[in-house]
């Protein structure tokens, strides 16, 4: 985008040589948190590989960081990553009806904001004819929020007060939406507490 080469790190449940072509997998398009600065998209490959072992195709997004492109470039690049995975669904055995987007820290914000945009909102669509909708969608208009939202927040988060997630949860719940929030006791802004077997089981369900 804008002359900047971008990459996806793709982790599959099996090696490319042993993929069962008859088995389709859900896909998580994952945005690595970086305070919207330059990312290290290899930072969580080990942790994300554990989700792949549970049957997910993982696509870790590299976006144009805020030092070279203003917001909402990061969300737009995430949308194009979603489209890329849809176009290449057959190649990676992705179930088109089970594409999700998520992320940690600023990546979680970017992932959610990617679903607030629409194709006519400054969108730079590299793949015309392919939408960037996912299984979990958050719309800016609360009456059109249709899909489930899952949030994790540490009770000792020193960056974002956990009350923020609680407030979002309460607002969406009052609108009759399907939303869950898990407050992880003693967890700060990220860390191993977010990647336990228990939290992974919640995600894959």
Language-model-detected regions and their locations in the chain:
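N-terminal cap/lid segment of alpha/beta-hydrolase-fold proteins
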Residues: 1-23
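Short beta-strand element of the alpha/beta-hydrolase
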Residues: 22-34
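The conserved beta1-alpha1 loop
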Residues: 31-33, 85, 141, 153
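Short amphipathic alpha-helix adjacent to the substrate-entry channel of hydrolases
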Residues: 41-60
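Primarily recognizes the serine-hydrolase "nucleophile elbow" in alpha/beta-hydrolase
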Residues: 80-144
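Short beta-strand/loop motif that positions the catalytic acidic residue
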Residues: 145, 151-153, 157
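C-terminal catalytic histidine-bearing segment of alpha/beta-hydrolase fold enzymes
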Residues: 150-152, 166-205
């Amino acid at each position: 985008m804008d002359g900047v080469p971008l990459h996806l790190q793709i982790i599959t449940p099996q090696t490319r040589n042993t993929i069962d072509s008859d088995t389709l997998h859900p896909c998580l398009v994952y945005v690595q948190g970086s305070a919207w600065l330059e990312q290290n998209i290899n930072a969580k490959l080990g942790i994300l590989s554990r989700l792949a072992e549970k049957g997910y195709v993982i696509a870790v997004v590299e976006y144009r960081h805020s030092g070279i492109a203003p917001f909402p470039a990061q969300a737009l690049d995430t949308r194009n990553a979603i489209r890329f995975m849809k176009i290449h669904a057959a190649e990676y055995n992705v179930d088109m009806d089970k594409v999700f987007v998520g992320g940690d820290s600023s990546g979680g914000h970017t992932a959610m904001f990617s679903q607030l945009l629409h194709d006519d909102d400054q969108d730079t669509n590299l793949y015309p004819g392919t939408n960037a909708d996912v299984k979990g969608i958050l719309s800016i208009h609360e009456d059109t929020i249709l899909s489930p939202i899952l949030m994790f927040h540490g009770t000792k988060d020193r960056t974002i007060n956990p009350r923020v997630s609680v407030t979002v949860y309460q607002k969406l719940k009052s609108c009759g939406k399907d939303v869950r929030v898990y407050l992880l006791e003693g967890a700060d802004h990220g860390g191993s507490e977010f990647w336990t077997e228990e939290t992974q089981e919640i995600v894959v369900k």
